[in-house]
Amino acid sequence: MASCPKAIWSWRFQRVVFRSVQLLCFSILIFELMTQKEVSAWTYHYSDKPYSWNYSRAFCQKYYTDLVAIQNKNEIAYLNETIPYYNSYYWIGIRKIDNKWTWVGTKKTLTEEAENWADNEPNNKKNNQDCVEIYIKSPSAPGKWNDEPCGKRKRALCYRASCQDMSCSKQGECIETIGNYTCSCYPGFYGPECEYVRECGEFDLPQNVHMNCSHPLGNFSFKSQCSFHCAEGYALNGPRELECLASGIWTNSPPQCVAVQCPALKSPEQGSMSCFHSAKAFQHQSSCSFSCEEGFTLVGPEVVHCTALGVWTAPTPVCKAIACESLESPVHGSMDCSPSPRAFQYNTSCSFRCAEGFTLRGADTVRCADSGEWTAPAPVCQALQCQDLPTSNKARVNCSHPFGDFRYQSTCSFTCDEGSFLVGASVLQCLDTGNWDAPFPECQAVTCAPLPNPQNGEKTCVQPLGGSSYKSTCWFTCHEGFSLSGPERLDCTPSGHWTGSPPTCEASKCPELSAPEQGSLDCPDTHGEFIVGSICHFSCNEGLKLEGSNHVECTASGRWTAPPPSCKVDTVSAPAPGLRCPSLIAPNQGTMSCQHHLRNFGLNTTCHFGCKAGFTLMGESALQCRPSRQWTAVAPTCRAVKCSKLPVTEPIVMNCSNPWGNFSYGSTCSFHCPEGQLLNGSERTACQENGQWSTTMPTCQAGPLTIQEALTYIGGAAAGTTGLVTSSILLALLRRRRRQKDDGKSPLNPQSHLGTYGVFTNAAFDPSP
């Protein structure tokens, strides 16, 4: 927005003039509101108070017509000269609507030639300047426009229209001018107030013409309309309606009425006509009668009359020869008639024939007799019949019969059941000779390729439909010492393939063997195939006895001659001296249970370990004494279950007892707060066997301070301060005295070599230099 203009007069003189103008305008406004008198010219008005744009428009619409709508440069100059200066300027009737500057009173978009913006305007600062002000008496841009936010407060510049409801007699457009208005008359009107209507004048009516008129604005004046019609028997020659135009001229000349004329008639062929005319030939009220020659009949009325509409009461009749009923070509055939192929008159003869594949049923020629009847009924064309299909070919048939069952162009398709295939054509058609186009097909069973007997085996088959045909099943077996590799059964499928490849017979194998625990295995089959005839020998380590056969053989059935043996302690022979393991004891906080076979902790002794609640076993839960006189693992231990470390923050104080290690099962911790604070939570917690503390960590919170405690704290603080000063003085004196007696020795180390607070080393053995 442009800055306010500089003062031209002294500020005192400006203030006096401004207040006087304000008072005068306000007085005029009050007088107009009280009298509510009509004015006869376009006048301008403004508010004495500033308002927002919306409120300013409401003010103008309430007391006047609307915010001012500027029409030309002269109006701008007039406003700038007449309206007093106001530092915030005036709102006018332009606003941005749908992003276009629009005159709000007429809803018309501001055109480029009507723009009167100040330099660099509109600039739309902050994207919200949607309303327009006018710089009245601005030194830098008088009468120019500027866009401003609609919420700013400015004076409302209003206008009161000169045009009223009855201006220009409601027959013209009232055009506002400064202090007056002019009338632009609508077409058909004239005069200063458009009070006169243009006239077209009357006209003489021709003979036999009747007229009916309407005169909304005066006799034979603008918008008068006249319609015309004629007496019966006469037709209108010219326009049916006339209208008086805005130019004072009728739309056309008046019409005339002429006598109605019917079309001329002629005698029908093979007949005659006789007419009576009242005036001219074939005019209104003329009549004509008709008759036919012998052998013909009249089709139509015997007499016709010319009507007032200029048409005959009926079409002209004709004389028609006696004819037989119409014939049509038979379906799938043709017809040839003479002498007339369409009229079917007396003595007309028609012959018939059929298309290929069809035969004629009925007379091939008929004739129209003098009785009007044909000598025989019309024939029909029937499709040729083919032989019926046999029912013994085992095929499924699906047929279509366009002209009847198994007749010409009948088509049949053949399919076979699962496991069989069609031999012959899959589709047959009935030809125009009455024969099928191919022999009847048949279904034959699907066959699979013959299966060979497996080497070293046998094959057994069941074939219900013949050799190796669909639904055949074969079973396979192997000779002794051989096992079947592949399917035991094969079936012939509908596709002509077996359900799998033929199997083979391979040499039988026995299950794989392994050495017994604390023993060995010796087999001649180095590749571990364990085929029929393989022999394996077993043995045990020293001090053990073989239980079972010491050798086994693989038989033709694929089984060993005996189960694999095992190695056990020899209870008959005395064990080797000293064959025992070191003695074991139960772990601390744990248990031990042993099973001794020969002696305590002897060979094969097994010991099981466990821990008490709150402890976890670290190591193997079971140990066994081996022949090497060593246990299978190191003896396990029991370790206490750990709880999470408790976080201690000031000012809370914690004391813990840890019988099995810091923060372990059985650890208990107690809590207390300094004097003057309260414990929020449990004062004791314990580490449980599940590794969780029994309660959550408590906290300290400030408690109420009594007068006695306050005095105690103040007194203690004072005493502490005094003691600190006294101690400092004494310490300074003591250090000064000791420096005088220093013999070169180092002072005692106040920290124990054990790292324990409050325990000091002997000065005689202090290693410090």
Swiss-Prot record:
| SMART domains in the record | CCP, CLECT, EGF
Q: Which residues lie on this side of the membrane: Extracellular?
A: 33-717
Q: Where is this region: Interaction with SNX17?
A: 760-769
State the InterPro entries in the record: C-type_lectin-like, C-type_lectin-like/link_sf, C-type_lectin_CS, Compl-Cell_Adhes-Reg, CTDL_fold, EGF-like_dom, Selectin_CTLD, Selectin_superfamily
Sequence intervals crossing the membrane: 718-734
Q: Which residues form the EGF-like domain?
A: 159-195
Name of protein: P-selectin
Q: Which organism is it from?
A: Ovis aries
